[in-house]
Each structure stands twice: as C-alpha cells, then as structure tokens.
Amino acid sequence: MASIGFQLRSSGLALVVALGLAVPAGAVDTAGQRAAITRSLDAQYSRIDALYKDIHAHPELGFQETRTAAKLAAEMRALGYEVTEGVGRTGIVAITKNGPGPTIMVRTDLDALPLPEKTGLPYASKATQIWRGKETPVMHACGHDIHMAVWVAVAKIMLDLKDQWSGTLMFIGQPAEEGGGGAKAMVADGLFTRFPKPDYGFALHVGPG
C-alpha cells in the first residue's frame, strides 16, 4: 500500500499540474514549475501531515462536519483566502483573486463513514456520532482526510506560485458526499450565484494502493 506521505505528495503535485493547464501564464517552464511545487510541498509537509492526522482522528458524518469545516476555514483564512462558511449547511467556499483570467474551482469532500476504525494507528478515530438514530463509530475510510489535506496544500502552493498564473481560485469543501445530498445543498444555497461561476472544476480521489 502506498504510504500516506507518498499519496499527499503525489496527489498534490498532480492537482497543481492540472491547475496549471487551466490558468493562463507566460512562457511555461515545466521543470522549473515542478521544482517550485516540490519546494512548496517540502516546506509545508510537516504542517499538512499534522492536519491530515488531526482530521483523520476527528471524522464527522455528512451534514455534521462542523469541526472539520471550521478547521479548514481557519486554515484557508490563515493563508489569506476569503472564506464563507455554512454554504449548503456545513460546506465552505474559499476564494482568492489574482488578476484577470478564468475562475477555477477545486473541490474536496468533508465527510466520513459510519464505520469503526481498526487500523491500530496512533491517530485512529475513536469518534462516534448519531447515524440513523444510533450512536455509531465514525472513521475516514474513503480517503477524504487525504483529500482535505491535499486541498489545503494546493491552496498554499498556488499562492506561492501566484506570479505564474492569473485568474480566480475557488476552493470548496463539500459536505455529505457519502450518500449524496451535499453538492445539491451547496448549489441550492447559491454556490454558483453568490460566488463566481467556475470555468473549470477539479477534484481528486486517492486509491487504496
């Protein structure tokens, strides 16, 4: 199985490279950009790893992601993004503008699953929440904890490289992906009317291996 560190790094690199294809820039120095991305990842890796472990240890079910959303909102505000919380109940939207150009949406999912964790990890979840009327163990069994950590890392990388692109970045945290409903709730709450309508949208999903 691929290590968490490898998944964080490789997913972050892949997403930033994909974003680079969508935003206008001057002459493209691919090798130079990859080196800059790697430097940014290396500089923030210990912080992102700690964020991942914190999120993993404190999972929350769909539309109950209050701690998770607040944690990510604080991270994005600290980076300088303009953040709106409570979009679609527990969703968040974080925006930064960097001159003229397309609006790029980057999405992560926020919720966990109603399952007991049996990994034995030192940061394993001991959380429980109400699911279908019963107190139930909860864990991040589908990689959303990694998705969120990568999402924050990419937000920082794009700021570090802002002299190499132009446009608007719109980072969204979607609640209730498991079982559905979260995306519709955000759209119904004005995701594409209260905020810039994206020209492109990106997301990722890690694999088990």
Residue ranges and their predicted role:
Residues 1-13:
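Bacterial N-terminal signal peptides that target proteins for export
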Residues 8-10, 53, 145-148, 206:
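Hydrophobic alpha-helical segments, especially transmembrane helices
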Residues 10-24:
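Bacterial N-terminal signal peptides
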